[in-house]
Amino acid sequence: MKNSVKQHASALTAVLACLALALVLYHSLAGGTLLQSSPYNSYALQAENWLAGRNNIANGENYTWLELAIYQGRYYQSFPPVPAVLMLPFVAAAGEWSAIPGNLIAMGLALLCAGGVYACCMRGGMQPVTCAFFTLFVSMGSNVFWMSTNDGVWFLAQVCALGFAFWGLFFAQGGNAVQDAAASLCMALAVGCRPFYALLLACWLGWQFYQRRSLKRILPALLPAVVMAACMMAYNFARFGSVTEFGHNYLPEFVRAENGQFSLTYLVPNLLQLLRPVTLDAQGQLHFEIYNGFLFFAANPLFLLAMVRGLLLRLPGHQAEVQVSVPLPSAGWFVAAMCLLMTCLTCMHRTLGGWQFGARYMVDLFPWLFVWFLGRPKWRPDSSAWALCGAAMLFNLYGALYMLNT
């Protein structure tokens, strides 16, 4: 037991050190930007206004580059509020929103997210090498790496949500009331960063009720989520008179849009954008789209790994992987259905994330992939899996640097 703990501690330390080094090197190449802050961190701006006793953004008309909602003549931060809460101590210490070391904070959140991935895999019974593999794949071999380089509002929302989701899955495997409550709180906080994580929370709560057949027995799992939902609904109502509106519908771009923020008319065009290829010309130059993304598994090959593993299990004569019980249904068909549903819901949004490298919205599906991975913890990465992970890290390092000049 002591030896196992030591091995896990060593592997986790090594992985976090690699991620920290990669981010420090990136910011060095970017011109020494680690301690700087992005002008797009409207969470910090909201925190500054909270500290001044306002739930709106004072002089919002001066921040023309930010995605601010306009409602009854006032300007409001238009994203769910949880990351803004995290900014409060930093803004209070710095004195103003633009003075915080935003990129360093983003790096810290990325390390916490990576720690959540490792802890989730470790509690699921995976070996240290497998835990390290998946942590590297998520933190450096996907769009998560590029989003970890900047404290812009969009990136903070996704990295925070993903981190909360993985820590939620970690606690959900604990099997007692205290850890059920912690899992519920973490997943609810993820919803407070990215609303589509409500699907993960709802499925987990539903699965707990199905297994325990008693509302009383799932109260520890239910209460934190209910309290968090009530707080966020009250905050929405105080600002917009609606418990479900956090501001995006009042963004000028969606007010002007013929079909609004969400519509079925966006579904097929956006799905096709997730299939746009990355090509190589005769001079060896890569070509890809940087608006609304490209082929979803090119920058996020974790999907490719899951698909290949799933297909191999269907081949005749292939040895089945040992399955274990996890806090959510881990059948391949169920996980695939949830990923498809999440993708369709995402593609019903007017945009797919705008300016970007890869397909960053697809990162929101990672917890579902890990539900499947956690159900099969005895698998260990072979040389081909490590090669895929290495290629993914190189491609995403390239992408992060490429976007510096775009």
Residue spans for each PLM region:
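Membrane-proximal envelope and lipid/glycan-remodeling enzymes
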Residues: 1-406
